[in-house]
Amino acid sequence: MSNNRRNVRTPTKFDKNTKTIQIFGKTSIVLKNMSIQERIDEVTQLLKQLKMIRDEETNTQKALIMEHEEVVYNYESSEEGFPVEPKTEEKDIPSTSGQKRTYEFMKDDFWNSGEFDKYAEKRGFIKKDGGGYSKIPKEYKPIHQDENSSILNLDCIDNAPALFVSWTSKHGLELQLNKHFENFSDNEIWNYTQYYTRGSVQKFLSEQDYQTDVAPNLALVQGGPYAKFKYIVQTIYGEFIGKDIRDHSQDLINQEAEKARFHLANMIICDLCYFDNYTCEYRKYFYMLTPDERSTYIELFLQKLPAPFGRKMMEGFRKETAENKIANTLGGAIDIVRRTIDEECIQRSYRRTIGGAVKICCKGNPEIPQRYGCYDITKRKKTSKKKWKKRSYKPDLWKKKKRFFKRRDFSKKKKENPGKKKFCPTGKKSCKCWICHEEGHYANECPKKTKEKHKDKVKLLMEAEEEGFEPLESEASDIEEIFEIVEEDSESSSEEDEEQR
């Protein structure tokens, strides 16, 4: 029993590539012959060995991951830092291929109606004037801050003036109504203002030396804590908004009024569907005007409405203000326009109902005022031109490759003197010489045949005579004849026949 046990035990030093299945295979036979206690001891020892093997394999895998990914566990120079192990688990991330996008990119109006600009702005991109988009860090992108906040932070916001006015009104009202602030000193008012600020505003106030810069100026301000607070607010407003409301308040009011006059005079509305938007913009600049000139711009509000609706509203507004039915204010003008629009919408809904249930023939009715030379406004029918697509042909694989030749020109050019070629019989000297190309003699009688430049032609003629060839000038024999095929038109052939007759 003991000998068998020694043979079964594995060595204390283990190889890295040892498999646990082999260990169980070797010991399964021996365990059958052991007692229960011996089996327990043997299994316990095997489990320890397996744990050592797994720990060693885990450390090896971590070392390989570190070498491959070059993970820095700790950025500190000291050795006390706690090592952060990388996550080696691979999670199954579901694929999004074939799924519908969360944002409908393929809409007809997506690229042209400004939807793409909004989509790009949400992701930190801003459209440039020259075209294209530029990426802006998130911390430098202006945000819209809640105006009900009790903390003043003017860093990178797009509604700084409105936020400043809301913050000033809230704390100013609290200083006036709360009796707790009646006995506040100048230093306590300064600290109170500084406490409810953040960012650049708080840094600006903290950099001020209270004893030399703040205290002397606050001492000159007459009034209670609210007057002191208002002085500090005017300093902040001039620093961050850029307007000196302390010494040049009237000049600022005049500038705002001039800006409002220009804006109201150039506003235009052509569609009453945008009446609410028109009202919001008009009201904003209307109350920047001085109280004396506002009555003129109430009528301008109605005159800018599309004709003849604007003229009708002007008459109704004057009539109702004279009867004291509505107030002679901008609110009264807005009210009469909205009531008229509501009544018109109700009448149109009735017309649709009646038109669908009962047919009314109004054409040709003499009681209806006629319109001479006028045409009814009809909606233009939308037509779409069919796009011509280039037709594609599949190659005919079964056809053999052909050689293409240049096409011959079969069009015949008309000759100046159509007919048979001129034949020069023997005895007549009207044909041209083959050597000098002059009329009056034959080639064998050419006086220029002895010249150097004509020797080649003369030699050719002599060789032809030696071979038995005769020129066309000589008469044809009875045995051999030479024929020439000439293609002629039907008209020319008929004329020649008449001449021969």
Swiss-Prot record:
GO molecular function per UniProt: nucleic acid binding; structural molecule activity; zinc ion binding
Record region (Disordered): 78-98
Keyword Lipid metabolism: no
Main location: virion
A GO term from the CC aspect: host cell
The keyword Nuclease appears for this protein: no
UniProt keyword terms in alphabetical order: Capsid protein, Host nucleus, Metal-binding, T=7 icosahedral capsid protein, Viral penetration into host nucleus, Virion, Virus entry into host cell, Zinc, Zinc-finger
Coiled coil: none
Domain of life: Viruses
GO process terms (BP): symbiont entry into host cell; viral penetration into host nucleus
SMART domains: ZnF_C2HC
Motif extent (Nuclear localization signal): 122-125
Zn finger intervals (CCHC-type): 431-448
Location in the cell: Virion; Host nucleus
Family assignment from sequence similarity: Belongs to the caulimoviridae capsid protein family.
Physiological role: Self assembles to form an icosahedral capsid, about 50 nm in diameter, nm, composed of 420 subunits of the viral capsid protein. The capsid encapsulates the genomic dsDNA. Following virus entry into host cell, provides nuclear import of the viral genome. Virus particles do not enter the nucleus, but dock at the nuclear membrane through the interaction with host importins.
Quaternary structure annotation from Swiss-Prot or TrEMBL: Interacts (via nuclear localization signal) with host importin alpha.
Protein name in UniProt: Capsid protein
Organism of this sequence: Cestrum yellow leaf curling virus
